[in-house]
UniProtKB/Swiss-Prot annotation:
GO terms for cellular component: mediator complex. Residues 137-162 form a coiled coil. Transmembrane segments: none annotated. The modification N-acetylmethionine is found at residue 1. Component of the Mediator complex. The keyword Signal does not apply. This is Mediator of RNA polymerase II transcription subunit 8. Residues 506-524 have a biased composition (Polar residues). The keyword Secreted does not apply. Component of the Mediator complex, a coactivator involved in the regulated transcription of nearly all RNA polymerase II-dependent genes. Mediator functions as a bridge to convey information from gene-specific regulatory proteins to the basal RNA polymerase II transcription machinery. The Mediator complex, having a compact conformation in its free form, is recruited to promoters by direct interactions with regulatory proteins and serves for the assembly of a functional preinitiation complex with RNA polymerase II and the general transcription factors. Named seth after the brother and murderer of the Egyptian fertility god Osiris.
Length: 524
């Protein structure tokens, strides 16, 4: 028991710092400053403890002043330690519960075990090929390897510097400009960019310079019949052109009167085989078509006339007189032919309605007309409501039809023509019908597809004496009234147009007075 050593183990030898480093660090003064700082912090904590016990309000101004002094002193101490701490202060890679408390004050003159392990592994890897050589040879080999690494670093730095110069990296002016394009092309691109920028920002229209415009000299086939190109290369509508020949004006007026749709590339054109499209306000109109009615066409014509008048006011006076004379002559020719072509099929349509209503025997001949008559059935639907013919058609019912087709004439000629058409006797009307050209009537009758044993009637006088009105029985009286009403309507409408072509003197004021007297003597 006595032989057992009861002496404590020898105390570990205290590790001393390098004397030079210790002198530079000046640990004595640093220790004094740290102790005074600790006392100041302890005094502040005691003051807070006293405030908490006595439940008194602390003087925050004094406390903040003391805190600022303590904070400044601590900052000064840390800055002094930092100057020499790089030589012996080591920050470990891992922090655990054991060394967490001593990390702020860990001072050592040697590396931590994990850092020593990494250094040993790197050293062995570096000396792996030269360990068997003597020490001087190892030093030379290591120096040669260091020189090679330094040369590689210099080459890499040179390449990086050249690259920065070429692309302007790290400079204020940015990358250098690439080889520029042609000056003319660059100016065009800049001008186009400016126009687009103005159009987007200010809403200005893009105006191309004359050298970049594409002047259209020819139209596609489906637009050649509708649009007209003038000498300046601009596309104008037919109604806006002032120099239109008689044939072009006749084609435009025929399209407006008949209601025929213009040719389109998406579908075939049936100008001579099908009847016109129905109007948008017609009883037979559907949602698939939206052809404007005569009222809308009249409004469009009035708007175009106003535009033409404004253009005429800008021309010299002698040119205005010449253009006005040409337009009046073209309007008379086109209107006479257009009205004659548009009214006769309407009468034929009413003729077919009378036949369909008063068929009584199976052996009677039938004349089936083609069903789609959109442009003419508007007249039929308004005058003959629902296919039922009114037995006594008064003059007041015929006036709207006459007014609708005579609206395009001027005021004096319109009233004179209408009064002469109302008061002319039957003996004068029927001979005038023979003066109308039968060539315009035959193709229209061919469109309506006359079938059966009846020959094609090319004249209105043959229609009045047709055998389908010779029905016997109880319908004789009604057929006679229908014949009279149709004769009266045809005489009043077609006779008025015949007077336009053959007897223009009937439009004088004295004829208007005679017609007015005849209307008062023979009231309907």
């Amino acid at each position: 028991m006595e032989t057992q050593p009861q002496q404590p183990p020898p105390p570990p030898v205290a590790e001393k710092l390098n004397p030079k480093l210790e002198k530079e660090l000046n640990l004595e003064s640093l220790k004094t400053r740290a102790v005074s700082l600790a006392k100041a912090i302890a005094r502040i904590l005691e003051d807070f403890d006293a405030y908490g016990r006595t439940n008194t309000t602390p003087k925050w101004q004094d406390i903040l002043g003391q805190y600022s002094m303590v904070n400044l002193e601590l900052f000064n101490i840390v800055e002094e330690v930092k100057r020499v701490s790089n030589a012996f202060v080591v920050l470990p890679k891992n922090v655990n519960a054991m060394n967490a408390a001593i990390l702020p004050v860990m001072l050592s003159s040697k590396l931590l075990p994990e850092m020593e392990t990494d250094d040993n592994a790197k050293r062995e890897q570096l000396l792996q090929g030269v360990q068997s050589l003597p020490i001087p040879m190892q030093i030379e080999r290591l120096k040669a390897r260091m020189d090679m690494i330094a040369a590689a670093c210099e080459n890499a730095e040179r390449v990086l510097a050249d690259t920065r110069k070429a692309y302007g990296f790290g400079t204020r002016q940015g990358p250098s400009m690439l080889p520029t394009m042609d000056k003319g092309q660059a100016a065009k691109i800049q001008e186009q960019e400016k126009m687009l920028r103005d159009a987007v920002n200010d809403g200005k229209g893009t105006q191309l310079p004359p050298d970049q415009r594409q002047i259209t000299t020819a139209l596609p086939p489906h637009l050649a019949d509708v649009l007209i190109i003038n000498d300046a290369g601009k596309i104008a509508l037919p109604g806006q052109s002032n120099n239109i020949n008689n044939q072009g004006m006749m084609q435009v007026s025929g399209t407006q009167f008949v209601g025929r749709s213009a040719a389109s590339p998406s579908g075939p054109n049936f100008d001579n085989t099908t009847s016109p499209l129905p109007y948008s306000n017609s009883p037979r109109a559907t949602g698939m078509v939206n052809v404007p009615s005569p009222q809308h066409q009249i409004q469009q014509q009035q708007f175009q006339q106003q535009q033409q008048r404004s253009k005429l006011m800008q021309l010299p006076q002698h040119q205005q007189q010449q253009l006005l004379a040409q337009q009046q002559q073209q309007l008379r020719q086109s209107s006479m032919q257009g009205l004659g072509q548009s009214q006769i099929p309407a009468l034929h349509d009413m003729h077919g309605q009378a036949q369909q209503k008063f068929q009584t025997s199976h052996g009677q001949h039938q004349m089936p007309y083609s069903q789609p008559m959109g442009a003419h059935q508007q007249f039929q639907a308004r005058q003959l409501s629902g296919g039922h013919i009114q037995h006594s058609m008064s003059q007041g019912q015929l006036n709207p039809a006459m007014n609708r087709h005579l609206n395009q004439f001027s005021g004096g000629a319109n009233s004179a023509l209408f009064t002469s058409a109302q008061g002319s006797p039957s003996s004068q009307m029927i001979p005038n019908m023979s003066s109308m050209q039968s060539q315009t009537l035959v193709p229209r009758m061919q469109q309506f597809g006359v079938s059966g044993t009846n020959p094609q009637r090319s004249h209105s006088s043959q229609m009045l004496g047709d055998q389908m009105f010779n029905t016997s029985g109880m319908m004789q009286t009604q057929q006679t009234q229908i014949q009279q009403s149709q004769q009266q309507q045809q005489q009043q409408q077609q006779g008025g147009y015949g007077n336009m072509q053959t007897n223009q003197q009937s439009l004088q004021p004295n004829n208007m007075m005679q017609n007015a007297q005849q209307r008062h003597q023979n009231p309907q």
